[in-house]
């Protein structure tokens, strides 16, 4: 299968000048390949570098060594650890999305504007972007009275749904999920898991961290286990089939 | 994407200077003084690009050279070395440090706009707010009084200056209003690049928030590039996708704003981030 992302001997070590030069190893020598359209689950105990790995791929962290090759449809690739910042901004705008458990709100910007901003960045007309967002608000179950309010005042579940909407609205080809269901109640968790299942059906490539092992097994095609900063083993789990899909969700 | 502006090895020395500090890579000292001759190294080896429509942040402590870099780009501070390539002149990509006086005025009045922390640097306090902005249109060769007035008033509405205050003198404006007039003045001739030198320094937090929102919405609507100088990394985080960190007149780190804040590499950047972010 065509690779979408290839991680080669990736290591991340934090050199903390503010702690007298202390070095903290997040992970070392991780290698794996994510084929196009597959879901790679990442598991491992807290502190074993799962989030750091995803942040290195998004270039929120600088990898210390190794390569992250991100392939396009023509088989060409770009090393995300070395690409110029301006290219990473373009990749984040057009090709790669990242959702963490923490919603990074933009102060004093309404829900509607938060959600359509990625489309405006890609040159969409405002009216078209609003139409697209309105479709998503229905799917994500965001009531109309919240559209023109500030998300900083919302509940955790509402914030997380808006976080995910903002990332999904411009149809990334690679999606990075860092515990998007953490600290959510059952209803919100179900909404988000159903959406991720639907994205899987559409063959979006996904790397996902889920704390709950059942969620992880349900969603993953492959699981990467991080153990003491090293991948212990790679195991195959059966592909999950969606039997009860009620969504008409087009990304 | 091709850069709008490319700054290469910019150097500004205050003082006599010597072969070392005037040379290509001056010896670093414990501060921004040349360890050999004692001249002030305001900036040296400063190299970066600005892309069309982006907001680039420059952070650093007082005296790190942030404002010097803006002054050099705005051609108000004479430099001691380096080049600044700009791509929007009719004659093609030019080193703007070597243009004639007329082109220099065109750059300052039409291609660039600047907003200072101190409104006395950016505004003429002996004419009205309206006059300040209209004057800039006059130097850009607009002559139709009604057209000038209409354009100024429209822009004042955009920057949310109350129409009752258009004709007041800058001394009678609040700090926030002075900054709004400066922003209007910077924008009036549809520049490619706006230089913002601590535009919200000294304002109270609610006014600061409104001015930052205005700058953010203008940069998104008009797709004008900006260089924003601030010592407040939270302000930079709100507006800029890329930042440069300066210390002792040199760039010590640069990168995506979230990367620099979440994974700072240099000792000073780590201290800066850990000092300002809860």
Which role does the model predict for each range below?
Chain B
Residues 26-28, 146-164:
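Conserved ABC ATPase "signature" region
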Residues 169-173, 177:
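Conserved ABC ATPase signature
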Residues 236-238:
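A short, surface-exposed alpha-helical micro-motif characterized by mixed small hydrophobic
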Residues 254-255:
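ABC ATPase "signature
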